Design a protein with these regions (language model features):
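Short beta-strand element of Class I
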Residues: 38
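Short, solvent-exposed loop/turn segments at secondary-structure boundaries
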Residues: 50-53, 248-253, 317-321
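Conserved FAD-binding catalytic core of PHBH/FMO-like flavoproteins
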Residues: 69, 88, 106, 111-116, ...
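Active-site-adjacent segment of FAD-dependent monooxygenases/related oxidoreductases
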Residues: 50-128
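C-terminal helical "tail/cap" subdomain of flavin- and related membrane-associated enzymes
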Residues: 2-12, 76, 86-88, 94, ...
Length: 430
């Protein structure tokens, strides 16, 4: 009796668009699946990151441990407050401490939140990526879903590729998202952030600048954020409302002469003014802040999946974008692997991914809606300036949600798949 062997399934060809933390994380995780033939396409000439610092929250650290990149981050690369606190809120006009946050008591020491230069996180991820599969100077210009279900990609230099799965990791102004959901629009929200990295030893000579992540709050959406980073780096980020009309706004960092708007911070307390003066002498990058409504789905055409800022245009509202992107990657790659092991097709894998992640983003947008309502109610009271600042911090603190920093995507995925490996119906797991 002859037993026929099952035909070997064809490799799954995957294109990842974008070389940020989400795209690199996807490259790492897809690289662990021996049946996946993946390529990462980055439009810039090299994998690089712009901007100042980035927060690694508890969930981000856990995901870096899961994908293996945590080992590439040296303690000198990041800053943690020596007193064990996680951050401060201060009145930017007076310097008065209004709120101080601490880590939950059960946080493992290696997962305490920290702040580091964005490029160092990217470098840590890149170390675990097969760089022979990374193609730079590849700007995606066209996407076409073929009758056979494959996706045809065309790039600015004339190169083309046909893939089974297209992963959009191309950021807040995602080309892949625009193709998948052409009616979804993002827009400039009226605020811009100015990020500068200055010399830490010089900044630490300023009396009144704490060794902690500090938001120096003011009114009208204006604030300054200061924080040491790893090594000799110190971050200064200033946010302010800018004119919407008559300006060309871009979401990526572009050089900016910060001295031209530094006087707008003269109402801040002396330590902040001195830090602003240092920033005005440094190399500042301007980031116009864009955001958009929640996507009802993060998949399309049975062959496209969005991850990171492409899937949730939140404009950095939670300071945890890298963690969210790595959660997306974890859920997507486990969903793909589940479908493969259970002889299901790619549409089933993407449907599973969507069922895991879309409710999570629904809950995150719900948090933002609550904050918007709080802010509107506060503004309607027309309080004196000092009282408005204190009330905003107090009310935000009382209603603050931190569950997203302790969310365990691996448990959510396991619960969703169930002990038998069958998909079930479940809401987002907090």
């Amino acid at each position: 009796m002859t037993i026929k062997s099952r035909p070997t399934p064809k490799p799954l060809k995957v294109a990842i668009i974008g070389g940020g933390p989400g795209g690199l994380g996807a490259a790492i995780e897809f690289g662990k699946l021996d049946y996946v033939d993946w390529t990462l396409y980055e439009k810039k000439p090299q994998i690089s990151e712009t901007g100042g610092g980035i927060s690694l929250q508890r969930h981000t650290w856990r995901l870096l441990e899961l994908n293996g990149a945590a080992k590439n981050i040296h303690p000198d690369d990041f800053f943690r407050s020596p007193d064990g606190t996680s951050g401060q809120q201060r009145n930017g006009r007076t310097g008065k401490l209004l709120e101080q946050s601490s880590h939950p008591a059960d946080t493992p020491p290696q997962q305490l939140s920290c702040r580091m230069v964005r490029a160092k996180l990217q470098a840590a991820l890149l170390q675990d990526v097969d760089q022979s599969r990374v193609k730079t100077s590849k700007k995606l210009t066209s996407i076409l879903v073929l009758p056979n279900g494959k996706v045809e990609l065309s790039f600015e230099d004339g190169f083309t590729d046909d893939v089974d799965l297209l992963v959009g990791a191309d950021g807040i102004r995602s080309f892949v998202r625009s193709f998948a959901f052409p009616s979804h629009k993002i827009k400039y929200n009226g605020q811009s952030a100015y990020r500068t990295i200055i010399h830490r030893p010089t900044a630490e000579k300023i009396d009144g600048i704490p060794q902690s992540p500090v938001f120096w709050q003011n009114t009208g959406g204006k604030y300054v954020f200061t924080c040491p980073l790893g090594g000799d780096d110190f971050e200064v980020t200033a946010r302010i409302r800018r004119p919407i009309e008559g300006q060309h706004h871009v979401s990526w960092g572009r050089p900016f002469d910060f001295s031209t708007i530094a006087p707008e911070y003269d109402e801040f307390c002396e330590p902040v003014r001195k830090v602003i003066q240092l920033a005005a002498q440094g190399e500042t990058q301007e980031f116009a802040l864009f955001s958009g409504p929640r996507l009802e789905s993060v998949i399309s055409h049975g062959a496209l999946a969005l991850i990171g800022d492409a899937s949730h245009p939140l404009s950095g509202a939670f300071g945890a974008g890298a963690g969210f992107a790595l959660e997306d990657v974890y859920a997507l790659t486990r969903s793909v692997d589940w479908a493969r092991r259970n002889a299901e097709g790619l549409p089933a894998a993407l449907g599973l991914y969507d069922q895991i992640r879309s409710p999570h983003y629904r809950d995150l947008y719900g948090v933002l809606d609550n904050f918007a309502a709080l802010n509107s109610a506060l503004l309607a009271e027309k309080l004196p300036v000092e009282e408005e600042i204190e009330e905003r911090v107090r009310r935000a603190g009382e209603s603050r949600s931190t569950w997203m920093y302790h969310y365990e995507i691996e448990k959510a995925v396991d619960k969703f798949l169930g002990a038998t490996g069958e998909p079930g119906q479940v809401a987002s797991v907090l």
